[in-house]
Regions:
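Acidic catalytic loop of the alpha/beta-hydrolase fold
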Residues: 64-68
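Active-site-adjacent alpha-helix of alpha/beta-hydrolase-fold enzymes
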Residues: 71-83
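Conserved catalytic core of Hanks-type protein kinase domains
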Residues: 5, 79, 97
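Short beta-strand/loop motif that positions the catalytic acidic residue
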Residues: 53, 59-61
Length: 114
């Protein structure tokens, strides 16, 4: 259920099951998600640190992300000097295969900048 909720309208059950199986086989640490959420909550606002970045940056965000609304991606891109923002319509908090080609093009474009 969580996978489907986070994914948005392009959820692929077979892909989600395969990914969950591979993640479980690779590293099963039930307390890990709690530690990760705690670390995120305790880390505070990163805006000032993002402003110090001097590297090509591509911020990728979906319009229907239930975990981090779109304004978070916009704010992140605005905080990083010269960052590019790639917004995927109807994408949740994952990256479905239908967007891979456009993401690859965005990364290639970014890598060609000096």
């Amino acid at each position: 259920v969580a996978s489907k909720t986070l994914a948005g309208p392009h959820w692929d059950e077979d892909y989600a099951r395969d990914l969950a199986r591979r993640n479980y086989d690779r590293s099963f640490h039930p307390k890990g998600i709690g530690f990760q959420i705690g670390a995120i909550a305790m880390s505070g606002d990163r805006t000032e640190r993002l402003a110090t970045l001097r590297i090509p940056s591509l911020v990728v965000h979906g319009t229907v992300d239930p975990l981090l609304p779109l304004h978070n991606g916009v704010s992140t891109a605005e905080a990083i000097p010269e960052a590019e923002l790639l917004i995927f319509e109807e994408m949740g908090h994952d990256l479905p295969e239908k967007h891979w080609t456009q993401l690859i093009e965005g990364i290639k474009s970014l890598s060609n900048k000096k």
